[in-house]
Amino acid sequence: MKRKLDANNVPSPEDSAGKSITAHSFETLKLDPRLLQALTQQKFTKPTPIQAEAIPLALDGKDVLARAKTGSGKTAAYLLPVLQSILQQKRNTPAHKSISALILVPTRELAEQVHRTAISFSAFSGKHVRSVNLTQKVSDAVQRSLLADLPDIVVSTPARAVANVNSSALSLERLTHLVIDEADLVLSYGYEEDMQSLAKAVPRGVQTFLMSATFTSEVDTLKGLFCRNPVVLKLEEKEDEGAGISQFVVRRCAEDEKFLLTYVIFKLQLVKGKCIIFVGDVDRCYRLKLFLEQFGIRSCVLNSELPVNSRIHVVQEFNKGVYDIIIAVDDQEVLGELRKNSKKQPRKSDQCSRDSEYDGAQTSRNNDQYSSEDDAETQPSKRPKKSAKEKDYGISRGIDFQNVACVLNFDLPTTSKSYTHRIGRTGRAGKTGMALSFVIPSDQFGKHKPTSIPSAKHDEAMLSKIIKRQDKLGREVKPYHFDMKQVDAFRYRMSDALRAVTRVAVQEARAREIRQELVKSEKLKRHFEENPEELRQLRHDGELRAARVQAHLKHVPDYLMPTKGRGSLSIGTGADVGFVGFKKTHENVIRKAREKNKGRGRGGKAGRGGKRVDPLKSFNSGGKH
C-alpha cells in the first residue's frame, strides 16, 4: 500500500508505535545471551529511547532511518541487531563465512570507535564474530589479506570502501546489512561520488540503517540511494542536546585577554574536571599549548595534521582520565562545514557561502532545532581548500568524549550549528556540563596582531545568532563576569609568557610535535598489544619546549592569589606563609655555638672532654721536671 506524501513530497513514516512495543530492558529484546553478557560487562543497564525503538524494528528486518541527538546511543542501536543477525546465521550454518555488514562513517576516529565497540559487544562470542577497520594505516597487502579472510563486519570510510571494492579486495555479494552512521555528514565531507559507486555495488535486499543527528537534504539523498520504504524515527527526547549544559559568554574580551583568562581559569582551578578547548586553527592550537606550558599547565593537541593512530590514542587516553585538557581544532567546522561540491558547480566564495548552510527549508517541519534564520550566517569571505587529510577528520561530531566537564570556546565557532555540536561534547548521558565562550568586540578586533584571527571579526554577529537559536530551544546564554581587578594582577605574567611564544616557536613546536607523533604512531601500531608497558612513553601532553622557558612563571606567589583562593594551589602551606612574629621559632645557631665552646681556652687539649690544665703550674724554665 502506498503512503501519502507530506508537504515536502516525502512519504509519511509508518506509525511504528502501534506495531512495536517499546523495550524497557535489553532482556525483552530477545538478544543472544552472549550479547546480554557483554552489555552487562559494559554497564548498559537499560536501552536508551533510540535503542528501544530501533532495535525491535531492525530485528524484524526493516530499514531504519533514525534521527537522535549526539550521544544518545545510536551506535548500539544498529550494532546489536547486526551482531544478533550474524550470531543467528552462525548458529544455523556454522561453516558459513562471508562479509555480512558494511558500516560507513565519515571520519577515521569514528571508524575506530565503532570498531572497538563492535569488539566489546562480541567479547563473549569467541571467534564467531570478526570485525575489520579499513581506515587503519596498514599496507595494501595486509589489508587485502584481512579482507580475504572474510570478516563478518567491515568498518570504513566511503573512500576506502570504494577503493577496496574496485580492487576486488572487498566482496559485497553476500552483504546483508549496510549502516551509514552520521549520515548527514557523509556527503558534506565530500563522499558523494563514493556513495553513488557503492549504491551500484551493494546488492538489492540489503537491510539499511541510516543514523543521523539531523534530517537534511543529504539524508534524503542517501535514503533515495540505499533505502526501500524505511521506518522513520524522529525521537523528541525530553532532555535534548544541551539541556543540562550551563552556557556562559564573556562578551567584551580583548584578543590577548583570551590567554589571560584561560591562564586564570586553569591556574586558579575555576573549572574542575576535564575540559575541551576549541580554537580556530592549528597555529593557535600550538600557541595556546606553548603558552600554558609556561605556567606548568599540561595539555595535548588534537588536529588533522597528527597521525590517525595518535589522534585515536589521544581520545582514548582522555576518556581514561590520563589527560585533563585537550586543545582541539575541528577543521570541518572551521571551514564552515563546507560541502564538497561537484566539479560542475562554481567555486566562488559567495556560492560556497550559500552552500555551506543546508538547514532551513530543506529540513522537515518536525525538526525545529534549526531555524531558517541561520541559513545565512556570516562566514569569512575566503576559505582554504579542504585537503584530503582534513576530509576524514572531525571532532565536534561523532567522537565519544566521556565525562567532559567544560567546553571552552577559545575562538567562537563560525556557525550557530557548530556551536550546538561543540557544546554537545559535555553534559552527556544525563550529566551536567558547562560551556564558556570568548567574544571579541568589533572595536577590539585586530589590535593585538600576534593573537588576532580573522574569524573573530564576526564574533558579535555570530553571538547574536547563537543566542537567538538557544532562545528558541528554551536555553539561556548567561554572561560570565570576571573580577578584573584581581585578574589584572596576573597580566604581567601573561605578557611575559605570551612574548616568549613567537611565530618561530609555534612553527618549531608544530614540526616537532608531528615528528614525535609519527614515531609514537609506529610504536602504537607495532607494539601496543605486545608491550602494554610502553603506553607510559606515549603521553601526548608532554612539553614541546619550543618557547623560551621561564621557570618562575610555573609558581604563583601567594600575594597574587585572591583572598578566597589563597593557599589553594600550594600543598602543605598554611595561612601564615610570609608571617614574621615577635618570638623566634628557631634557635640561634651562633649563640648555640658560643654556649658550646664556652670555657674552652687556647691552651686546652684539642680533644673534647679532656682535663683542663693551668699553664702557670706546668711551666718549667729548666726544661726538666
From Swiss-Prot:
It holds the Pfam family Helicase_C. Its EC number is 3.6.4.13. A motif (Q motif) lies at residues 24-52. Residues 347-357 have a biased composition (Basic and acidic residues). Residues 55-233 form the Helicase ATP-binding domain. It comes from the Eukaryota. The keyword Translocase does not apply. Residues 1-21, 339-393, 590-625 are annotated as: Disordered. One of its GO terms (biological process) is rRNA processing. Residues 361-370 have a biased composition (Polar residues). Residues 260-485 form the Helicase C-terminal domain. Signal peptide: none annotated. GO terms for cellular component: cytosol; nucleolus. ATP binds at residues 68-75. A motif (DEAD box) lies at residues 181-184. Keywords: ATP-binding, Helicase, Hydrolase, Nucleotide-binding, Nucleus, Ribosome biogenesis, RNA-binding, rRNA processing. One of its GO terms (molecular function) is RNA helicase activity. It catalyses: ATP + H2O = ADP + phosphate + H(+). It is found in: Nucleus, Nucleolus. Residues 599-610 have a biased composition (Basic residues). The Q motif is unique to and characteristic of the DEAD box family of RNA helicases and controls ATP binding and hydrolysis. Belongs to the DEAD box helicase family. DDX56/DBP9 subfamily. ATP-binding RNA helicase involved in the biogenesis of 60S ribosomal subunits and is required for the normal formation of 25S and 5.8S rRNAs. This is ATP-dependent RNA helicase DBP9. It comes from Ajellomyces capsulatus (strain NAm1 / WU24). The lineage of its organism: Eukaryota, Fungi, Dikarya, Ascomycota, Pezizomycotina. The gene is DBP9.
